[in-house]
Structure formats: structure tokens, C-alpha cells
């Protein structure tokens, strides 16, 4: 990350203080905001500086030297580095706790659970959606109030050293890793690469005297926390998840003392992150009754662990993303429910590199051996299907062919798990189910 000259950093901080936030998108409402002209593969924000100012932006940041001397424009040597450096400088003014959160699965859902629990006692600013990369994290920080009460920063990565960069920008005082599994294997360079990449969050805490919330149910997370002096255990083994399909609340969570509370959230694989929200809330003074109320009120969205009654079928929609770990969690949990007519509609998993063929074969066999009627779509599942002719498995090379088959069958009275990578877009199947 680049270091801005002090006078340039001061100018940018002054511009941020005079604005209502920061944006990189001229399609958004820019009134009162600061605009960063980023350059990407398919766009160049430098071409929209005038448009941003005309749209009400208070200030613009660009690399285009023709704007030198304009009172509402700052010219920088490199726009992304300037965005990241400004975000770190802005964050360094705060005295509040900053919680960094990463993991192979469940980051966004966990962030929302933690946010909602903390918000019962704190003025919380948290990552919007999944703005969790080298651009999203700086924007998360820069769109926080000048003096927030608590900040929760989601951090995503598909290569080593990316979490380290995000931690350098956000400088978390606390951290939580949901789990360390088989995600983005291609970019991370295999399973060990995933471990090293996720561990970077705890490495930052170890170096800077931070506190790690340690998920005891994941051996790799426990190992990754070894160098952190201040650790708080997240004791998931003492809690229980009871599923109740067809009810308003899809699950009941049993506390160690035997008391239960309802949740709308689907999937027992979410239990560790529910417990994390409780433990983190308790650490920061959230009374149990407020934490419980926040968790019971939480309703998942954006195709993550959502139970949907279509009128014809009961659908567990978990189609936001997929990797071998999350797929295995979902299939095992769904099969354990002992549904009367269980289907699984699964789409290809992306970014697995050399592990792709084996991962799809294993996942298909897991679903079939569990007694699920399996429908799959995508190239990798197609290769796996060529080696397995079980009649309970139907495969389609393309999404349109899958839709045609569903239209012909018109399933009714089924319980259906729908899961695949973001690129598969399987949430589009709901009208046909």
C-alpha cells in the first residue's frame, strides 16, 4: 500500500470530513459525497470526474493531471492506493473497537448476526452487503461516521496476502474467523494456502496486541490463533441446534443451560456463528435478553440460508455461493432433516483448480448416498455424472435445459435444497419450483 505525502493526506482527509461519504460509482447518488475515480478492466472513472461534480459530489480524486488546480479535485499518483491510504488515515482517528471478520464460509451472515447483536447496545457501523475486498473495505471505513461507536469489517480474499493488506488498512482491534475450509483453492494455492491466507487476520492481531475470538469447533482456526495473546473462546460444543421445518421459525437454538430461543435462520452449520455473535456481544456488554431478541428477529436475505415456501414446495435456498466445505455442510444438514421427498439441485463450484473434478464427484456421491434425489447443472458435475449412472441423478449441461426439465416435471410436495456458486445464479429457479 502506498504512502501519501502528509500534505496530500491532509487535503484528502479534509475533503472527506466535508462530505457525507465516499463513492466510486457515478451511477449512485453522489450528492454530498466524495468521488474516487478508480480504473478497472471495463471502466475508467477518470472519464467521469466532471459528471460526478455535476451530480453533486463535493470532491473528486483522480490521476488525470488536467484537473490540477481545481479546488474540488485532488490529483493523486495512484487512485486505488490513495483510497486505501485515506481509509487507514481516517480509521486511525477512531478510539472504538474494530472487529475484523473473515473465513471460508458464512462471513456475511455472521457479520449480520454480530452487527444486530451489538447494535442493541452500540452505535454500530458494518460492511454493507459483501463489500469485503481491497476496494470494499476502504469504502466501508470511509463511509463510517467520523466517531463511530463500533465498526465491524468483513474481509474476503481469494489469494494469500490479501487479508494481510485488508488488516493493514482496517487495523482491527479484534478478529473472528468463521472457519477455514476448502474455498478459492485455485487462488490460494491449495488447502494449506487457504489456511495461511485466513490466518493473516490473527497474525495481525498477534503483532498488534489484538484479541481473537476463537471458534473451538474448527481445529484450523484454533491452530491459527496460537500466537495471539488475548483469546476468547467460542464454545459451540455446548450449544444445540433443533430444526423445525414448516414452522415460522425454522430452528430453535438450545443454550448450555437448556433454555431455547427461536431463529428464522436455516442450517445447523450456522450454529457456530450464532454462538460467536452471542459470545462477542457478551464480551462487549450486550445483555443476554437483548442478544436473544436480536437473533430471533434476524431474517436471512440475498439467497443465504433462506427457507422459502413456494406454494408447491419447501425450498432451502442457499444459492449465494458454494465451495466444497459449504456444500458438504448444506447436504449433510439437509439429509439429516429426514424429509419425505428430498431433492438437491446443485450447481458447479468455481475456483477449485486441480481439485475441481474430485470435489464434484465427492459431493455428488455424498448427496446420492444420503438418499437425496440429485439434479445438477454445470460442466464439472457433468464430468462426474459420466462416471455414475444412478437413476436418482439427473444432470444438465446448461441452466436452460434444467429449467425445461423442471417445467416438464412440475415438482410438488417436495423439500428441495438449492445451492451453487454465484455464477450459477440458481436463485432464478424459484419460479419453477
Where are these regions (language model features)?
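N-terminal leader/targeting and accessory segments in enzymes
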Residues: 1-85, 89, 266, 335-340, ...
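Peripheral docking tails and interdomain loops at the edges
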Residues: 395, 414-431
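Acidic, Mg2+-coordinating active-site environments of NTP-dependent enzymes
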Residues: 62-63, 67-70, 176-314, 339-340, ...
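Glycine-rich phosphate/pyrophosphate-binding beta-alpha loops
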Residues: 301-303, 319-329
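Short amphipathic alpha-helix with an adjacent loop that forms part of the alpha/beta core around
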Residues: 168, 401-410
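Generic hydrophobic/aromatic pocket-lining and core-packing "Φ" positions
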Residues: 49, 163, 198, 202, ...
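Phosphate-binding loop of NTP-binding sites
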Residues: 82-212, 216, 220-228, 432
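ATP-dependent carboxylate/acyl-activation modules
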Residues: 101, 302-304, 423, 427-429
